[in-house]
Amino acid sequence: MRKLVAVCSLIILAQFAPAAAQAGPFGDDMAKCMVRATSPEDRAMVVQWIFAFIALHPDVRQLASISDEKRVALNKRMADLTMSLLTDHCAEETREAIKIEGMEVLKTSFGVLGRVAVQDLFANDAVKQGLSDFSRNLDEKKIKELVEAAK
């Protein structure tokens, strides 16, 4: 049980690391169920949870101020969502995936959910504008030359 709790605590963050394994068909079914079972609000909370813990890193800590109370509340909401997905909405898919593909399926399935949640975030107009602002600083000529040289 401790192993399951530890895995569940880190699984969403898995999308930021290189994938060590691909999910099989049962893991795919589990991931699809998890995405279907979450609302846009749930996925926004997942991104908030990820952000709250990334913001603890010394290299980015000065960019965001998240109170301990907010972090505790996000932990509770993420734990509630995790339990709901694993033991209620996607219980059958979770059982089968773990039985056939092992505990690693938790990492890959929650990684899919995390990626979908982040994609939702990037669909926001303000985020798109911020990315557009970034691209103004790129040297398009050099990029075109690089692409042409790669052909």
Predicted regions and their residues:
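Bacterial N-terminal signal peptides
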Residues: 6-16
